[in-house]
Amino acid sequence: MKKYFVAILLLGLISCNKKINEKDFLTFFEKSNYLETPRYKETVDYCKKLTDASPIINFTTIGKSARGLDIPMLIIDKKGEKKVQNIRKRGNIIVLIQACIHPGEPDGKDAGMMLLRDIAVLNKFPELLEKVSILFIPIFSPDGHERFGPYNRINQNGPKEMGWRTNAQNLNLNRDFVKADAPEMRSWLKMFNEWLPEFTLDCHTTDGADYVYPLTYGMEIYGNTEENLTAWMKDKYLMYVKEKMEKKNMPMFPYIAFRQWFDPRSGLNSWTSAAMLCQGYASSRNRASLLIETHMLKDYKTRVFATYELLKESLVLMNMESENLKNIIAKVDEETEKGELLKKEFPVAFETAKDSIIVTLKGKEYTVEKSDLSGGDWIKYTGKEKDWEIPFFNKQIPLFTTKLPQAYIVPPEYDEIIKCLHLHDIKFSTLDHETDIEVESYKIGRASCR
């Protein structure tokens, strides 16, 4: 009897020692009264603290920045697995959450660290890992992140200081997904090829207009994604998260891009993203992605918690829809591999259709003033809320289409192109002898940079 008593007592002591004090895991953001975001070292240290506190979190790095800083990534899996093969064997889907590709917009970093703490350390939402494993990149662009200052986003309402838009080479990483000039992007592409996440959430803060919504979103649902995956994003994902966010008094709205920038009454445009952008690149790989754009004029606390809730609700749906999403993507991948795209016209550019619908934009009243500096017009928002009934041009139609060739031939002197093919995991073979092949060739008449 005494032996049993001692054993029970020891178990009780062990249990007490493992009890988590929530205050010990407050983030820098929370400790600052929701006004500040941590620097690189503080962010990495906190991520390692979470790893030490939870057996289901693994800390790793995906590569280095141009200046040699590690790009951190957390792997969160209910079994503590850190290898993609083992996670895939269990049938889990993989969700990638990334922040600070534009380090002046750090909302997703602070939201992500709080959410992963609540899931894996405080055990508030263990159900979010039932059928989903999470990858979290808190700082995609470490060098840009450490170009820290209070004036990097002069029209943004917090945090007190933030990083810079580009990396140390002055490259905008969210325009680099195809050309992959930056070492950060080359590392990211290798990670993406290894994990191939079914869903990516890319966290940003927007520029521009004033309105009620704490966040807006972009999703590739206008023609450049396979139709079944498009239907899932529109009818399953967006319908679910928009309803949930509305109930939380955090309404969502499509990314606001006025047809004429200085005239909100001109209506709203939709668009398809090029593959140089994250959501466009995910679409080109037959994967779903969401662009999160919190509203720059909202205070930092509001923006971070709106991001937190959207990330959480996204994970709820991913667990509900894991098999469905996995099956849709598997079928699309299979059709792509079989060459189904070669049988039909392939759109290479889109334009906005003239058709529109009337939507209610929860906006703000404004006046048009003459600028003393430029003499041009500028919009001055009054801060008073107003519902605007305006047209939303929500249809995109192909501007140019083409028949995809059976293959492309890349001359060996274009070694940079060949390296890029490797980075994008594009399969190709090398000719081992001279041969004559009848081909069609393209000539680029006009090139421009963005």
Give short role names for the model-derived ranges.
Residues 4-13:
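Sec-dependent N-terminal signal peptides
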Residues 16-450:
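Structured catalytic-domain cores with a bias toward divalent-metal coordination
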